[in-house]
Amino acid sequence: VLFMEEDAALAAVLADQADVAHTAVSYSDQEIEGYHLMAVHTVDNRGFNLPCSEEETRDGIVYGNAFTADVNVRRAINIGIDREEMIEHVLNGYGTEAYSVCDQMPWYNEKSAVSYDPEQAEQLLNEAGWKMAEDGIRRKDGEKAAFTLLFNNGDSVRQALAEYTANQLAKLGI
C-alpha cells in the first residue's frame, strides 16, 4: 500500500507502478483496468470546529469569532448543512454523515446527530439577530455573518468539503 499524495498515487497506478494505492474518493469514479475499488470503513472524520468565544486579540493573534460565539448560530450551522448531499456530490457516495469527532466509536452519543433543516436554521439565525441584508449576507450590528474555514494543503477532499460547506451556508446568508 502506497501512502502518497493523492495525485501521485493515482499516477503510480496508471503507470502500473503500484499494486494497491490509497487515494482520494474524488477518483472513485474512474475505472482502471486490472484494479478494483475497495471501500474500507474507518473512523476517519472530515469535519470542522467553530470558535465558541468572542473575538479577541492576544499577542497579535486573533482568537474567537463574534458570529460563531453564539450557540444558536452554531446550532443553525449544524442543521443548515446537508451532509447527505455532500457525501453524494463530494465523496461520490463513499462516506457516512459525521456529527462529532468520535462517530462510530464506543463512546459516541447518538444525540449528537441532527437532521438537515434549513428553515429551522434560518429561524435560529433570525432569532439570534442575524438579519439578511440586500447583498445576501446576514449582519448584526454591522458585523457580517462569517467565519474562516481552513484545510490542509494538498488534501483535495477537505478542500472540496470546505468549498461545498461554504456554498451551502451561503444559501443561509453566511
What is the predicted function of each stretch?
Residues 1-90, 106-137, 141-174:
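Extracytoplasmic/periplasmic ligand-capture domains
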Residues 96-103:
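Flexible, glycine-rich active-site loops centered on histidine and acidic residues
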